Swiss-Prot record:
Chain coiled-coil ranges: none
Naturally occurring in which organism (per UniProt): Pelodictyon phaeoclathratiforme (strain DSM 5477 / BU-1)
PANTHER family: INNER MEMBRANE PROTEIN YHJD (PTHR30213), UPF0761 MEMBRANE PROTEIN YIHY (PTHR30213:SF0)
Main location: membrane
InterPro entries linked to this entry: UPF0761_bac (IPR023679), Virul_fac_BrkB (IPR017039)
Taxonomic lineage: Bacteria, Pseudomonadati, Chlorobiota, Chlorobiia, Chlorobiales
Localization per Swiss-Prot or TrEMBL: Cell inner membrane
Protein name: UPF0761 membrane protein Ppha_1623
Length: 428
């Protein structure tokens, strides 16, 4: 029996823990880099502003669709109260009064006005669709008919599903959980209903909206994370409104406006954070061991291929951007291409034109292959270089490092331009 087993430690459990820590070391920086690159806070602000303009139209469309179905008439008031009272936690009755008043007035809106409200609601759903697909790096837009069908389905079937859910749950609550010990179970189930509802909504959002295949496990994991963050944000926001009340102190009677915007902004940050999490789960590939894939030129062929397409397009007058390169460069993922372009931009080899295209900034006839090799950061390979431990002040290692560097300089003392021309002459 091994020493660890005698001490009560399971080697397999310890190995899994080490592997989990290693995965987190890779995943967290990858997630944060994508979070910053996709400008989640800016996207949430844009969606929050558009949501403020679309709140009443969307609620009006939902309730109008439910009015079409007579079976949902008894539940209309319950649904209206549910939507209004749970829209912003801790806001009191002021916002609820205004929203209820606005929704009541929409019942007398003429047909043309109703069509306009429906179009506004469609625009919000379209913006959400575009923002999520930007996170998933989907550059091919949906076909017009496909997109309209999706948005129409969300606006028409969504309220019907909500109404059906309310009807079914009401039947269960009042026919089954009416008396006896089941009342306590009913109370417990009701306390979990908002969280379960949030998980289901986030799951459908992450599973269906991206115009790309999303794995069930990834979408469900992101939905759980988003639902947890949403519950935490509700509790924090309620505490902030009831105890700190900065908005009310500054704005007085108008405080409901910034409070509403701030809450909607928090909500969209949660939604987009969950979406980024789901994307990163699918985009991050497991890091292989160095011994299995070692190559002294790792990363150089990919960077040269990107440079070659940009250089060739620049010479031929057909400027390149990320969307075009994703179509012509095979085997390079959107995240990999973005990583290559970021390196070239940061080191001044490329610049972005006023049209959003990429252009060469350096003289490739004087820049050598070693100059390109030297700018590739260690993080470009993933986390495996982080496993290399410094040799300290060993004289032998310094000598070896100096010899290897000189050897690389001599072997790579080639201008980049002829190499790129050679790449462009290769058959596709």
């Amino acid at each position: 029996m091994g020493e660890k087993e005698r001490r009560g430690q399971n080697p397999k459990t310890e190995s899994n823990a080490v592997e989990l820590v290693s995965c987190m070391r890779v995943f967290i920086p990858f997630f944060w880099k994508n979070f910053i690159h996709d400008r989640i806070f800016l996207g949430a602000g844009s969606l929050a502003f558009q949501t403020l303009l679309s709140i009443v139209p969307i609620l009006a469309v939902i309730l109008s669709i439910l009015n079409v179905f007579v079976v949902f008439t008894p539940f209309k008031r319950s649904l209206e109260d549910f939507l209004v009272q749970n829209f912003m936690p801790g806001a009191g009755n002021v916002l609820n009064h205004y929203l209820t008043d606005f929704i009541g007035k929409t019942a007398s809106v003429p047909i043309l006005g109703g069509v306009f409200l429906f179009i506004i609601a469609l625009f919000l759903i379209s913006t959400v669709d575009h923002t999520l697909n930007e996170i998933w790096e989907v550059h091919a837009p949906r076909k017009a008919l496909q997109g309209f069908t999706l948005y129409w389905t969300v606006l028409t079937l969504g309220p019907v599903l909500i109404g059906s859910s309310l009807a079914a749950s009401s039947y269960v609550w009042y026919m089954v959980f009416t008396d006896g010990p089941l009342l306590e179970l009913k109370t417990r189930l009701l306390s979990f209903f908002p969280f379960i509802n949030s998980v289901a909504a986030f799951f459908l959002l992450y599973m269906l909206v991206p115009n790309r295949r999303v794995r069930f496990v990834h979408a469900f994991s992101g939905a759980l994370l988003a639902a947890l963050l949403f519950e935490l944000s509700k509790r924090w926001f309620t505490f902030y409104i009831t105890h700190i009340a900065t908005f009310e102190h500054i704005y007085g009677a108008l405080s409901v406006i910034p409070m509403l915007f701030f809450w909607v902004y928090l909500g969209w940050i949660v939604v987009l954070t969950g979406a980024e999490f789901v994307f990163c789960l699918g985009a991050l590939k497991p890091v292989e061991r160095i011994a299995d894939v070692f190559s002294p030129l790792r990363g150089v062929p990919e960077i040269l291929s990107v440079l070659a397409h940009i250089w060739n397009g620049q010479k031929s007058g057909n400027a390149m951007n990320m969307k075009k390169m994703l179509k012509v460069i095979e085997g390079l993922t959107p995240s990999g291409l973005r990583k290559v372009i970021d390196i070239l931009l940061q080191n001044g080899l490329l610049h972005v034109t006023v049209n959003g295209d990429l252009a060469i900034s350096r003289d490739l006839y004087t820049m050598t292959l070693y100059d390109l090799y030297a700018i590739i950061p260690s993080g470009f390979w993933g986390d495996e270089n982080g496993l290399l431990i410094s040799g300290g002040n060993s004289v032998h290692l310094k000598t070896i490092s100096k010899g290897v560097t000189e050897c690389l300089k001599n072997s790579m003392d080639l201008p980049l331009a002829p190499l790129l021309e050679d790449i462009n002459q290769q058959p596709e």
